[in-house]
Amino acid sequence: MARALSVTEAVSMKKETLKLTGAWADAFGEPERIGVWFIWGNSGNGKSSFVMQLCKELAKFGRVAYDSLEEGASLTMQNTLRRFNMAEVNRRFQLLDCEPMSELGERMDKHKSPDFYVIDSFQY
């Protein structure tokens, strides 16, 4: 069993963060580089558009893999990539075409795998 941390020890620990810019910094501050974010909303409320813009921001800090489980590499996805000018982050953004979770896990285990993974959308 690991030793419990004192308050002083806990608050003095250095964490790697994302220095987000503009509206992203205004909304989320400087989040820790690791973690899980859930974006929820009703169908048609702009979740995929929001997440695509988030991917573009995350690409400033590393490589992003976007697993589009609903749209894949469809015309709709092509239009979304164009609308948000994702070509600007071409070398730091990968579109995964409906990659199953088992294969995604294998991808994550590979050497030099992307730094961030986005799954759109996860059925619960």
Where are these regions (language model features)?
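Pre-Walker A adenine-sensing motif
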Residues: 15-31
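Conserved alpha-helical scaffold flanking the Walker A/P-loop in AAA+ ATPase domains
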Residues: 101-112
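Conserved P-loop NTPase "ATPase switch" module shared by AAA+ and STAND
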Residues: 110-124
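Secondary-structure junction/capping motif
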Residues: 6, 100, 121-122
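Short, basic/glycine-rich phosphate-binding loops at helix/coil junctions
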Residues: 30-37, 113-116
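Conserved P-loop
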Residues: 33-103
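Charged, amphipathic alpha-helical linker segments immediately N-terminal to NTP-binding catalytic cores
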Residues: 1-14
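Structural motif
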Residues: 29, 56, 109-110
